[in-house]
Amino acid sequence: MSKPSDRINLTNQFLIAMPNMADPTFSGTVVYLCDHSERGALGLVINRPTDIDLESLFNRIDLKLDIEPLLHIPVYFGGPVQTERGFVLHEPVEGANYNSSMSVEGGLEMTTSKDVLEAVATGTGPKRFLLTLGHAGWGAGQLEEEISRNGWLTVAADPRIVFDTPAEERFEAALGLLGVSSSMLSGEAGHA
């Protein structure tokens, strides 16, 4: 068992699925890790838009959204856990105190309470955000095991990829942070 000081902390990192990813749910994905500790990990897939947009989701939860540029922003598949629950990854809003927010080491926040969506609907919420349904979760040691089996690459997250890069370009953009492209990846791990 490793000592706490020996553990790596992957909070505020991207997980980039390797070509040999066994779980098709995560094939080709980039996951933003919101929390990683000895108890496990929680992240949001940032490159799987659904066919649901903000307007239709807000209608479902009885919120009126009249801000034209926001109406057709896609809602993302955040992962296979709690798929009926919304998770908002966003930049902090000065003076805002949402009911259920978690500050992510590195400057972003993840909020799961409806009040952040109410603020978005009135134009007082975060300007840069990504809304997912569901999240990805790993039990204690599970993510570390997947990484050791060459299932994921990790790299420090860049908010510009989360918020400014088109969804279909996020996988390559995240790989670019490592100086590689998908054409350079192999599903085979080498061990010396």
Swiss-Prot record:
- Which Pfam families does this one have? DUF179
Report one GO cellular component: cytosol
Q: At the top level of its lineage, which domain of life is listed?
A: Bacteria
What HAMAP family does UniProt report for this protein, alphabetically? UPF0301
Similarity annotation: Belongs to the UPF0301 (AlgH) family.
Could you identify this protein by its name?
UPF0301 protein BamMC406_0754
Say which species the protein is native to: Burkholderia ambifaria (strain MC40-6)
